Amino acid sequence: GPLSCGRNGGVCIPIRCPVPMRQIGTCFGRPVKCCRSW
């Protein structure tokens, strides 16, 4: 969820993560990804 995403240093981004980032989970169901920079 959004809280665990933030604790892991990620941000919630709709649809898909931009290129320099990778997905580490989801935020609000499947459409919103939790993304983190390398």
From Swiss-Prot:
Gene3D superfamilies: Antimicrobial Peptide, Beta-defensin 2, Chain A. It is found in: Secreted. One of its GO terms (cellular component) is extracellular space. InterPro entries: Beta/alpha-defensin_C, Defensin_beta-like. Keywords: Antibiotic, Antimicrobial, Defensin, Disulfide bond, Secreted. One of its GO terms (biological process) is cell chemotaxis. It comes from the Eukaryota. SMART domains: DEFSN. Disulfide bonds join C5-C34, C12-C27, C17-C35. SUPFAM superfamilies: Defensin-like. GO terms for molecular function: CCR6 chemokine receptor binding; chemoattractant activity. Its main location: secreted. It holds the Pfam family Defensin_beta. Neutrophilic granules. Has bactericidal activity. Active against E.coli ML35 and S.aureus 502A. Belongs to the beta-defensin family. This is Beta-defensin 12. The gene is DEFB12.
